[in-house]
Amino acid sequence: MSHFLTFCFLSLLLLLHGANAVTETELRSLLEFRKGIRDETSHQRISWSDTSSLTDPSTCPNDWPGISCDPETGSIIAINLDRRGLSGELKFSTLSGLTRLRNLSLSGNSFSGRVVPSLGGISSLQHLDLSDNGFYGPIPGRISELWSLNHLNLSSNKFEGGFPSGFRNLQQLRSLDLHKNEIWGDVGEIFTELKNVEFVDLSCNRFNGGLSLPMENISSISNTLRHLNLSHNALNGKFFSEESIGSFKNLEIVDLENNQINGELPHFGSQPSLRILKLARNELFGLVPQELLQSSIPLLELDLSRNGFTGSISEINSSTLTMLNLSSNGLSGDLPSSFKSCSVIDLSGNTFSGDVSVVQKWEATPDVLDLSSNNLSGSLPNFTSAFSRLSVLSIRNNSVSGSLPSLWGDSQFSVIDLSSNKFSGFIPVSFFTFASLRSLNLSRNNLEGPIPFRGSRASELLVLNSYPQMELLDLSTNSLTGMLPGDIGTMEKIKVLNLANNKLSGELPSDLNKLSGLLFLDLSNNTFKGQIPNKLPSQMVGFNVSYNDLSGIIPEDLRSYPPSSFYPGNSKLSLPGRIPADSSGDLSLPGKKHHSKLSIRIAIIVASVGAAIMILFVLFAYHRTQLKDFHGRNRFTDQATTRDTKFGRSSRPSLFNFSSNVEQQSSSLSFSNDHLLTANSRSLSGIPGCEAEISEQGAPATSAPTNLLDDYPAASGRKSSSGGSPLSSSPRFSDQPVMLDVYSPDRLAGELFFLDVSLKLTAEELSRAPAEVLGRSSHGTLYKATLDNGHMLTVKWLRVGLVRHKKDFAREAKKIGSLKHPNIVPLRAYYWGPREQERLLLSDYLRGESLAMHLYETTPRRYSPMSFSQRLKVAVEVAQCLLYLHDRAMPHGNLKPTNIILSSPDNTVRITDYCVHRLMTPSGVAEQILNMSALGYSAPELSSASKPIPTLKSDVYAFGVILMELLTRRSAGDIISGQTGAVDLTDWVRLCDQEGRRMDCIDRDIAGGEEFSKGMEDALAVAIRCILSVNERPNIRQVLDHLTSISA
């Protein structure tokens, strides 16, 4: 009996010892797994010892970094190596011996490899997080065998393929995050697979399907789902039905932005938990459900921007809203008569009308208020008294008039943009007393007098020493007077200084060279005299002092800028070793610019297209620093909340990453081509944007200098140059070569669509192609890219916010690609990426120069003067191109000399940039027409249209202006002095015609002989007919018939 008791006691001791011991199999599995891991800082393996270093091989290795054991059984239950700077190709099959592993978390490293099916054999796993790495391949179907799994995060990797079936088996799953991969599947089928989940983030993938689903498809998650993010996918069809959306009783966050969801929104009924609703960048239309703006739904954030909503918004009585974005829709009527509560309000890009002063009645006290690009009128209320917290104010591009109100109190204004209105009178002194102001844009108004200064020399243009934060000052296109003071150098942080198109005078102070951060300086179209100061900031990428009365020698450090930075005007300004500028056509005649609307048009390109966009992003970048994430992804998990701070960046990557000889300065500010709120408001909800994450892994976030110049057209400095006027966006001068850095295939989620079978290339080949900037336009930026085989392409990057939805874009691109004509440069392909800044058009690169270069480039003269017969040949070939397009009911839409290329040796015409408006949103088309109008090529009927769109007859008008330019060798933007005062080109030609002196208009280079004088007069008569009123204007076939009948 005693032997039996002894045996039982020893057996119990052995059993107890084994229950608290790690097995050798587990240790060996761990050590095998370690072999694939490297520390990126030391390039060594992670410091796990082998079993020989353990005092007792059966002891749990709790001292190994990231390893945890069960205190009761001793088995390894957790491997947590989050954000340790590790890399390596992991072999997940080596973990099969860890049969009791509960937590495997490897996020935020640089691991790669495939997730093998055997991982599904570790049925004890409860938490699996492989996010923010480089894992690739399909998600194995056996992952559905992890019965105990409650948290699965595979986001921000390179997984691809279909969504695996069998997720219905994961009854314990509460959080599913697969965002930023290449996974596809029908969202309706996926909803059917999920059971009891609370958090679902499938954003930035390729999921498709609609949301108008039967109740049985969503019944398994309708009671539990709290957070749903399907943004940046390819969803189409309708939104949830009224019945189905009403079944989600616990839903807190819904983000479906950047899809193709269409139709009207249903009534939302009772949604007691809904706090964030983001439906921006879809195809929704109809009325905005009123309950979304009332307190019945406790929304904190509502973003319906960039859709097609219509109707009026009478009142907004929600007491919970902190962010409301209804921008870029078709909303109309008066501004809401009441607005209870909100911190960020964006109603821009609609057609709201009425008196802007109604905002004084609002109870809301916003930090950010954007009412830009509407039809508002009336006078501006004093916002410092109405909104004490206001830091960002934009009312640009309206019809608000009267004098500017004074600002006072403890306001902390960061950005004020009142450009493109009808303000008059003096600028109040108080605008220059807010030390926090970083950006002030009062351009394109009717302001006069000096820029005020609180000091003894108030009559001069001075800058306050107490104004250290100013980074952008744009007062262009007004009637300001006075001198530029010597102490302007106190604006130490200024990056953009635009004082063009005013009546400023005096000499340029030498203290301009103290503006060490200056990137853009435009002092053109004033009456400055004297010499240009030496040693201006070397990093400037936009510089223009043309149309002044400067003299002396151009400083050596400025001689890399093109001639259009200095001329026309400045007839006494010279450059050693070069022929002086031809001043015979000098446009700096006294009083020229202030007596003509065209000088104002020219400045629109800088002040409107660039500054207005950029200002809005300065503004929001500042505002975002004051907002906190109130609801992060990790609310539904046990992860550290610090992880999502990277999604709060204000910058977004450009498709092209430049590396050039232009020095780039760092800045605390970041600028984006996207909208004021839609790009960055996701930080409020903790929902990441695809773009923000790419800047983490794919390319550095764009700094202020880079995007500053993308959005702010250079005033003929290094970055771009003029085609007929000093501020136009034509590609007259090339930049230094830069590298075209498209995301490589392992990161490039979009597709190349070929419209011509003869073109064959891959995204990888495009990504490594050396490229140089050719120019910028209202559409975006133009590059020349050289492929591996030497073939050269012209790549047009389309600016964010201009492009139609993918289906419409593809349909129209196919039509444009089908156009085949010997004088038309064909569209060969296009690239469509998941991010808005990834829209590219590809065509063959042409050797040759634009018609604008042949007509106007004279410093030095690079081209022989064109004869009348050569000019007539150009006109006929352009008309033939237009006839081809018009026969297919497709207007060119952007016809100007910079889009007419003359190929050697016989100056054969090749037309470019045609029909691009068909790929653009209505706002993008309107912006293109605005720029056409600024340059003088837009038909008058387009300027007065509420929703302008290019027509066949507007092409004829533009052709008529170009024909006048061919015959007169004067630019459409020229201001010409005559007996009746300063007039533009078309008015001058009409006047000459009325007075019977047509030959006075003809260019001296071709008007000398009598042989072709009748032909020249006949051609000029054709041009005049082309610019008649739309009802009297001939069609292009009639124009071509007349031109071909002229002898030359």
From Swiss-Prot:
Under the GO molecular function aspect, what terms does this record hold? ATP binding; protein kinase activity
Instruction: List locations, semicolon-separated.
Output: Membrane
Note the Gene3D superfamilies from the entry.
Phosphorylase Kinase, domain 1, Ribonuclease Inhibitor, Transferase(Phosphotransferase) domain 1
| Topological category with respect to the lipid bilayer | Single-pass membrane protein
Entry keyword annotation includes Protein transport: no
Task: Identify the stretches annotated as LRR repeats.
Answer: 100-120, 124-146, 148-169, 172-194, 196-217, 224-246, 250-272, 273-294, 298-319, 320-342, 365-387, 389-411, 412-433, 436-457, 469-491, 493-516, 517-539, 540-560
- Protein name in UniProt: Probable inactive receptor kinase At5g10020
Higher taxonomy: Eukaryota, Viridiplantae, Streptophyta, Embryophyta, Tracheophyta
